[in-house]
Amino acid sequence: MVLMDPLANALSVIKNAETTGKTDCVIDPASKIIGNVLKVMQDQGYVGEFEFVDNGKAGQLKVKLIGKINKCGVVKPRFAVGKTEMEKWEKRYLPARNFGTLILTTSKGVMSHYDAAKMGIGGEILAYVY
């Protein structure tokens, strides 16, 4: 079976594990973009520690869940967002103001929309979590 979108698969695994009340999950295969998205989610307090495990193929990521995710998913197509358009996309993907996080890929790396707004840069929306 071929995975069309590994990031969507990873967020689906996390959401399903959170829904069933598990304390950890394994994301297979691992990639840099998934690791960077998990780092942003960890910085925002949605997941605990995570570690890369080499299985001889692409590797796996073991993620500790802390039960704070209500919903998460990818944004397709990957919309380009200017620094002045952030609020429009917050209204579209997040349930309330200052609740949840949009995860962006920018020229400075993967970051939350809060950090991108502080730096005054835009990017492309990868995912949302709340």
Swiss-Prot record:
<comment type="function">
    <text>One of the primary rRNA binding proteins, it binds directly to 16S rRNA central domain where it helps coordinate assembly of the platform of the 30S subunit.</text>
</comment>
<dbReference type="InterPro" id="IPR000630">
    <property type="entry name" value="Ribosomal_uS8"/>
</dbReference>
<dbReference type="Pfam" id="PF00410">
    <property type="entry name" value="Ribosomal_S8"/>
</dbReference>
<dbReference type="InterPro" id="IPR047863">
    <property type="entry name" value="Ribosomal_uS8_CS"/>
</dbReference>
<protein>
    <recommendedName>
        <fullName>Small ribosomal subunit protein uS8</fullName>
    </recommendedName>
</protein>
<dbReference type="GO" id="GO:0019843">
    <property type="term" value="F:rRNA binding"/>
</dbReference>
<comment type="subunit">
    <text>Part of the 30S ribosomal subunit.</text>
</comment>
<keyword id="KW-0694">RNA-binding</keyword>
<comment type="similarity">
    <text>Belongs to the universal ribosomal protein uS8 family.</text>
</comment>
<dbReference type="GO" id="GO:0005840">
    <property type="term" value="C:ribosome"/>
</dbReference>
<dbReference type="InterPro" id="IPR035987">
    <property type="entry name" value="Ribosomal_uS8_sf"/>
</dbReference>
<dbReference type="GO" id="GO:1990904">
    <property type="term" value="C:ribonucleoprotein complex"/>
</dbReference>
<dbReference type="GO" id="GO:0003735">
    <property type="term" value="F:structural constituent of ribosome"/>
</dbReference>
<keyword id="KW-0687">Ribonucleoprotein</keyword>
<keyword id="KW-0689">Ribosomal protein</keyword>
<dbReference type="GO" id="GO:0006412">
    <property type="term" value="P:translation"/>
</dbReference>
<keyword id="KW-0699">rRNA-binding</keyword>
